[in-house]
């Protein structure tokens, strides 16, 4: 459940939960921007004036710049990542006009061989790709040359691997101090899970999302084979699609924050994002605690809704 996830050791160690003055807990910043960290602040005063202020705040209509350019035109992104979460984030940046160069291992991103390449077509849209052996000196020098001219670097290596490859933040900063360096992985760099490999079902289940989308708990009793197949399919449907794209959106948003901070402060920085924190935010409606907090409203077994006034009804 989300309430169990709030005290998860990796969530706590990576700063995804902060203590409130009333003894409760709430989500921390969306990402860890190492030079311009976010401040969640304290709880707002119980004052209806906040609602009036929000209503009166002018809204800016979305759109292109006056010259027709997309918002990230002129921004160069170097992606050294595989599978879905980080590559999809880079594709979102390409949708906003960024030039994205994807560095793949010899033989290509393994995701190209899954699902007949259908998923890969989306996560690699809008990019130019090249295959490089990062463990070779020649390959490393090519990548360092690309880094020198990049605005953003995205990778999804576990802690320690970039340093061994010569592309850790302190190494990259020496040749490009203005770079926005996005480090995205499973559990985060701190805490007991830092060195564990991660696939999407783990953060999806660990942060409470699966239980919420299941509608009811998996029976604890032994099941007949047909019932077991039914529950297996139900588990997969509740956890297969969300965790990676949830993380992609957080990566994209955090990079945009880094680019804005660079524009305002004149310096690049390292940004840390992990799948646990991203999927905690996907469950933000209940990822908090305070005295007297009600239980999370759960959908019924048929997944028709949360209550009599928030559900699907059959109409004739």
Residue ranges and their predicted role:
Residues 6, 87, 110, 164, ...:
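Generic structural signal for helix capping and beta-alpha/helix-loop junctions
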Residues 165-315:
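Active-site-adjacent "lid/gating" segments in soluble enzymes
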Residues 78, 120-174, 185:
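A structured beta-alpha segment of the ubiquitous adenosine-cofactor-binding alpha/beta core
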Residues 98, 102-130:
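Glycine-rich phosphate-binding loop and adjoining beta1-alpha1-beta2 segment
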Residues 13-17, 117-122, 197-203, 289-290:
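Short, hinge-like loop/turn segments at secondary-structure boundaries
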Residues 23-43, 119-141, 145, 203-212, ...:
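Redox-cofactor-proximal catalytic regions of oxidoreductases
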Residues 84, 107, 138, 160-162, ...:
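Glycine-rich nucleotide phosphate-binding loop and flanking beta-alpha elements
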Residues 1-107, 173-183, 261-264, 279-316:
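Acyl-CoA thioester-binding alpha/beta core of soluble enzymes
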